[in-house]
């Protein structure tokens, strides 16, 4: 027996300290609900749980991003719904104007409403926005830049590659011409390159700069072929330069229409030849005239057919693979048009880098829809307007269908993200959360050990007192 060192008390105290530490940890876990409260509790488990927390937070934010994307799409689709309603109304007006019972005054009134609806379409295009971001003015579509302001790319199809295209207009499309034949003299051609009116039998016929050959022909046909006319035409002289002449004795003039003053010659080249070959769009697209069929040749044995359609200042190139570009051309010019990807709206619909969804909303206005120069002042032009508005309605419907597909995809993405977050949260719970029942068993065990340890420590401290009995004896 020793009195300098109470080994039993030291052992009991040491064990009691360990029991107290275990009891403290158990109390901490029970009060917090977490198995891991610090890195020392489970270093690997802590690292895993933190990565899971990061992923869960990213998935939840991605779900909110997708919901915001749906809001954007619904905003654009709502505006397009109204645009399509206006196009339907304009088509209805065109059908009305095509009826032969209408007078010129009736058609003029109809034209006024069409013009107002066109202006409203342009207003919707420039003002529709979400969170101050314009949606229908082309900023959410692929961007394009032209180094010549006389040639501007208005719209392009999805199959158009992101690269540079060289566009050459060797002859600008000319407006329709009218020819006046004066008895006993030579013929003179009057090129109507401006908005003007022709007075026939005290009745004014309006000819617009954008009127096609058929438009002019129909207006003159309805007025009669041989009429008394007073007109100041622009006459093309021998040197090809325009001259102004006034017809003094204008009775008995035969008023006829001729073909366009000049055919238009268009050439488009993709500067990336390998890309052009891979896409099958050929290295060049060229054509002349109205609705001219052209052949695209890249190499021997490779040939495709495309259509170059010219309507006033607008040139549309389309091939059999729906490679489609629409340009606005002002006179003879050459330009390099660069197509970029900078415009689309990329929605972050995943928790990690690169998990994005591209949303493209094409520019929607009267230029892209082709309704800017529509007129229904004659039966012929009204008939043509019906087709123009039908095509515009189909184009808007196609855009709305694409937006609907975007929305359906985003809704499924939200469901998928929510399920992923749910499953990952469940996995995190298994790693991080404490099993309360099991931990309560541990706590009870440590509590009993603590109480018994205190009792045994008291007993160990009393043992040295037994030495006094030896000294007393």
What is the meaning of each model-derived region?
Residues 1-473:
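Primary detection of the long, small/polar-rich alpha-helical "axial" segments characteristic
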């Amino acid at each position: 027996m020793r009195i300098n060192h109470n080994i039993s008390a030291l052992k009991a105290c040491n064990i009691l300290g360990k029991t107290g530490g275990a009891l403290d940890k158990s109390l901490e876990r029970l009060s917090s609900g977490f198995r891991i409260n610090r890195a020392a509790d489970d270093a690997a488990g802590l690292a895993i749980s933190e990565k899971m927390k990061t992923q869960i937070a990213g998935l939840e934010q991605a779900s909110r991003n997708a919901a915001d994307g749906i809001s954007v799409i619904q905003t654009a689709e709502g505006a397009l719904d109204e645009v399509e309603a206006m196009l339907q109304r304009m088509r209805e007006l065109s059908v009305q104007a095509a009826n032969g019972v209408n007078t010129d005054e009736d058609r003029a009134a109809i034209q006024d409403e069409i013009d107002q609806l066109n202006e409203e379409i342009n207003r919707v295009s420039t003002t529709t926005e979400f969170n101050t971001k314009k949606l229908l003015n082309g900023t959410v579509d692929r961007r394009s830049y032209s180094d010549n302001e006389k040639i501007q790319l208005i719209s392009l199809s999805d199959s158009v590659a992101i690269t540079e295209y060289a566009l050459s207009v060797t002859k600008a499309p000319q407006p329709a011409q009218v020819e006046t034949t004066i008895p006993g003299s030579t013929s003179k051609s009057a090129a109507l390159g401006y908005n003007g009116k022709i007075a026939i039998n005290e009745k004014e016929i309006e000819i617009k700069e954008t009127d096609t050959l058929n438009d002019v022909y129909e207006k003159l046909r309805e007025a009669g072929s041989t009429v008394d006319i007073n007109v100041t035409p622009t006459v093309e002289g021998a040197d090809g330069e325009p001259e102004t002449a006034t017809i003094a004795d204008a009775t008995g003039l035969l008023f006829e229409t001729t073909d366009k003053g000049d055919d238009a010659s268009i050439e488009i080249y993709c500067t990336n030849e390998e890309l052009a070959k891979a896409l099958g769009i050929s290295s060049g697209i060229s054509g002349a005239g109205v609705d001219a069929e052209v052949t695209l040749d890249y190499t021997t044995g490779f040939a495709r057919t495309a259509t170059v359609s010219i309507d006033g200042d607008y040139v549309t190139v389309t091939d059999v693979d729906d490679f489609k570009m629409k340009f606005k051309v002002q006179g003879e010019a050459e330009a390099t048009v660069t197509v970029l990807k900078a415009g689309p709206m990329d929605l972050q619909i995943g928790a990690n880098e690169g998990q994005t969804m591209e949303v493209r909303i094409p520019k929607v206005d009267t230029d892209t829809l082709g309704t800017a120069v529509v007129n229904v002042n004659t039966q012929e032009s009204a008939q043509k307007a019906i087709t123009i508005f039908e095509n515009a309605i189909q184009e808007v419907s196609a855009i709305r269908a694409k937006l609907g597909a975007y929305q359906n995809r985003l809704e499924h993405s939200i469901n998928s993200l929510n399920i992923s977050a749910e499953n990952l949260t469940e996995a995190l719970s298994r790693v991080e959360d404490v099993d309360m029942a099991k931990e309560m068993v541990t706590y009870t065990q440590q509590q009993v050990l603590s109480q018994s340890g205190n009792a045994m420590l008291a007993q160990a401290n009393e043992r040295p007192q037994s030495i006094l009995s030896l000294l007393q004896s």
